[in-house]
Amino acid sequence: MIEVLLSGIVLGLIPITLAGLFVTAYLQYRRGDQLDI
């Protein structure tokens, strides 16, 4: 039961972590474009 709970937490955190990294990189990319202008 504990293994199932841990696996569920990991599977739930992975997409959130990837989404957070993607959004952060996207915001930094747009900020760089604005500075170039």
From Swiss-Prot:
One Gene Ontology molecular-function label: electron transporter, transferring electrons within cytochrome b6/f complex of photosystem II activity
Alphabetical keyword list: Chloroplast, Electron transport, Membrane, Photosynthesis, Plastid, Thylakoid, Transmembrane, Transmembrane helix, Transport
Membrane topology summary: Single-pass membrane protein
Record bears the keyword Transmembrane helix: yes
InterPro entries per the UniProt record, alphabetical: Cyt_6/f_cplx_su5 (IPR003683), Cyt_6/f_cplx_su5_sf (IPR036099)
Gene Ontology BP, a term: cytochrome complex assembly
Localization in the cell: Plastid, Chloroplast thylakoid membrane
Pfam families: PetG
This protein's GO CC annotations: chloroplast thylakoid membrane; cytochrome b6f complex
Keyword S-adenosyl-L-methionine: no
Transmembrane feature ranges: 5-25
Quaternary structure (record): The 4 large subunits of the cytochrome b6-f complex are cytochrome b6, subunit IV (17 kDa polypeptide, PetD), cytochrome f and the Rieske protein, while the 4 small subunits are PetG, PetL, PetM and PetN. The complex functions as a dimer.
General function of this protein: Component of the cytochrome b6-f complex, which mediates electron transfer between photosystem II (PSII) and photosystem I (PSI), cyclic electron flow around PSI, and state transitions. PetG is required for either the stability or assembly of the cytochrome b6-f complex.
Stored HAMAP family: Cytb6_f_PetG (MF_00432)
Family under the similarity heading: Belongs to the PetG family.
Protein name listed in UniProt: Cytochrome b6-f complex subunit 5
